[in-house]
Regions:
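PLP-dependent aminotransferase-like
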Residues: 1-66, 73
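Active-site nucleotide-sugar/metal-binding loop of Leloir-type enzymes
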Residues: 28-30, 78-82
Length: 134
């Protein structure tokens, strides 16, 4: 986050769940806020409905850290369907691991296209540059 010139603002947790406390999110939002980045801690899903309501109210993206939430569902749906994106880690300390690595689950084609370019050093194919000076 810092590397990209952004400044994280931390929001306290709900002591009962260990997850971000939705009641405290709005107080942390400023005109510079662009996203809410909650973590599903130890397989306990965040209150995705309330977080999305807050994000919609302020026009913010929601990017979940779902590294602990493989297979976790809320109302019969995977937590990976919540928000604009979910991130997964395959580090050795996670439930499913490859020693290192991860995955992104996105819900819109434009974001996926941009991420695909970034992961391939800005190339769309063998010769087409899409992001100059990456």
């Amino acid at each position: 986050i810092w590397w990209n010139g952004c400044k994280p603002v931390f929001v306290d947790i709900d002591p009962a769940t260990g997850n971000i406390d939705p009641d405290k999110i709005e107080a942390a939002i400023t005109p510079r806020t662009t996203a809410i980045m909650p973590v599903h801690v130890y397989g306990k899903p965040c209150d995705t409905k309330r977080i999305q309501e807050i994000a919609d109210k302020y026009g913010l993206k929601v990017i979940y850290d779902a590294a602990h939430a493989f297979g976790v569902e809320v109302n019969g749906e995977s937590v990976l369907t919540a928000g604009d994106m979910s991130t997964l880690s395959f580090h050795a300390t996670k439930v499913y691991n490859t020693l290192e690595g991860g995955a992104l689950v996105m819900h819109d084609a434009e974001t996926k296209k941009r991420v695909d370019y970034l992961k391939n050093f800005g190339f769309a194919g063998e010769t087409e540059d899409t992001i100059i000076f990456l």
